[in-house]
Amino acid sequence: MKVAVLGAGAWGTALAGHLAARHDTLLWARDAALIAGLQARHENSRYLDGIALPDALRYDADLGAALAHGAADDALCVIAAPVAGLRTLCHAMRDAGCVPAHVVWVCKGFEADTHLLPHQVIAAELPEQQSNGVLSGPSFAREVGRSLPVALTVASASAECRERTLAAFHHGAMRIYTGDDVVGVEVGGAVKNVLAIATGISDGLGLGLNARAALITRGLAEMSRLGVALGGRAETFTGLTGLGDLILTATGDLSRNRTVGLQLAAGRTLNDILGALGHVAEGVRCAQAVLALARAQSIDMPITQAVCGVLFDGIAPRDAVSGLLRRDARAE
């Protein structure tokens, strides 16, 4: 199978390395200098340093060439751009005049200005593209790059897209499950990043494992309420792309969103944290969108509201926690 991976960040690079073990894989990035470095060293020293990439993996800064590769009869196109760049990439794909027949995306979050999920952005920008889906689940790029075990879910309304994605990714240490709840999978992947900031704050303040467990559990309830209101199925949120991804992102030391929370608890400013991080922290980008959607649906999401207060309203982390503890008692 031919596979084109659009986006050479940490996640796109790790997935391309995995795919290249079995398939004719081409990794694209718009940054010619990044591509030149990949071609010379077979390592993404900018985003995934220390991980050797397969010799068979090819690289290109020409989007047209990458799209042609991913548009072959027996091919798959993987969009690994962040949500913030998804619409721009779709524009570029359309302008290139070559939209692959089978597309799967791996980005997580809501578009900041529109509050749209990735599938809604793609439907608006590439309406002719019908065989598509989302690949998501509890996964750190560095561990996938090291070929450590991982389980992911592909969700799509298209059986052909599910089968093609399964054929591409299900090998080696990667196990793929299939489903059709695109909305549920996407909401889980977005909201868990916001909740991971909350658990990072709690851990950074030294509030203990009891508090962490409470935040994860009540956070899962928030995620499920919003997801069901937006059209997802409740059972999706107890699976890999809901609870599984939440546990990993909220507790794993490789989590950028958890790191944001830890650093906020230590008294650092958000601008300083993001500057030092050097990578995307999707929980910061989409927190306000999550809260706005919750309010529009009249859904109570107190943990998300507390995170937004710390990120954007100048509320001290300890005061945000105190506010949660002062909430009226209620039935679970």
Swiss-Prot record:
Q: Which GO cellular component terms are attached?
A: cytosol
Q: Is this entry keyworded NADP?
A: yes
Query: Per the UniProt record, which EC number(s) apply here?
Result: 1.1.1.94
Keywords carried by this UniProt record:
Cytoplasm, Lipid biosynthesis, Lipid metabolism, NAD, NADP, Nucleotide-binding, Oxidoreductase, Phospholipid biosynthesis, Phospholipid metabolism
- Taking the record's annotation, the residue ranges forming a coiled coil are none
Q: Which NCBIfam families match?
A: PRK00094.1-2, PRK00094.1-4
Residues given in the record as NADPH binding sites: 11, 30, 108, 141, 256, 280, 282
**Gene coding for it:** gpsA
| Species of the source | Burkholderia orbicola (strain MC0-3)
Lineage, top-rank taxon, reads Bacteria
Instruction: Please state what the protein is called.
Output: Glycerol-3-phosphate dehydrogenase [NAD(P)+]
Q: Which residues form the active site?
A: 192
Binding-site list for sn-glycerol 3-phosphate: 108, 137, 139, 192, 245, 255-257
| Reactions accelerated catalytically | sn-glycerol 3-phosphate + NAD(+) = dihydroxyacetone phosphate + NADH + H(+); sn-glycerol 3-phosphate + NADP(+) = dihydroxyacetone phosphate + NADPH + H(+)
| PROSITE patterns from the UniProt entry | NAD_G3PDH (PS00957)
